[in-house]
């Protein structure tokens, strides 16, 4: 299996409910290592850049507002097939459709407030990681 990295965000709905430790425990129990982590307040510019792929979607403005509404925790996760593994651990975007035991099934409030973001490919993970971390920030 290939060791790879993926990017994660614990969103404002999760940090507001003090779920960082609980979500980190799920991540680590799944065999992923947290090799970089930082709690930040995402700026509007950062959120717009990060979610630029959704700029033409009707929910874009709401998404940017939500992601800047409170602290988030940005993370780099590492492990065997980390991108696919973390997407499995997160669960479906809609928590009502997420599998039992997944982060979104356990902690998400709604489709919009679904607690976590995870990269959808290794290529996007590298781009997303670089928006928030330098290689020196990532310690294995």
Curated annotation (Swiss-Prot):
It is found in: Cytoplasm. Its cofactor is Mg(2+). Belongs to the NDK family. PANTHER family: NUCLEOSIDE DIPHOSPHATE KINASE, NUCLEOSIDE DIPHOSPHATE KINASE DDB_G0292928-RELATED. Homotetramer. Major role in the synthesis of nucleoside triphosphates other than ATP. The ATP gamma phosphate is transferred to the NDP beta phosphate via a ping-pong mechanism, using a phosphorylated active-site intermediate. NCBIfam families: PRK00668.1. This is Nucleoside diphosphate kinase. It comes from Methylobacterium sp. (strain 4-46).
């Amino acid at each position: 299996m290939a060791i790879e990295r993926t990017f994660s965000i614990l969103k404002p709905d999760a940090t507001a409910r003090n779920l960082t430790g609980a979500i980190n425990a799920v991540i680590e129990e799944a065999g992923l290592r947290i090799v970089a982590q930082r709690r930040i307040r995402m700026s509007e510019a950062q959120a717009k850049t990060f979610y630029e792929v959704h700029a033409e979607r009707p929910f874009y403005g709401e998404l940017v507002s939500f992601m800047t509404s409170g602290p988030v925790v940005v993370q780099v996760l590492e492990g065997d097939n980390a991108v696919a593994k973390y997407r499995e651990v997160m669960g479906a975007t809609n928590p009502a459709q997420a599998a039992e035991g997944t982060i979104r099934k356990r902690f998400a409030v709604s489709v919009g407030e679904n607690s976590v973001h995870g990269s959808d490919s290794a290529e996007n993970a590298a781009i997303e990681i670089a928006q928030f971390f330098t290689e020196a920030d990532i310690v294995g």
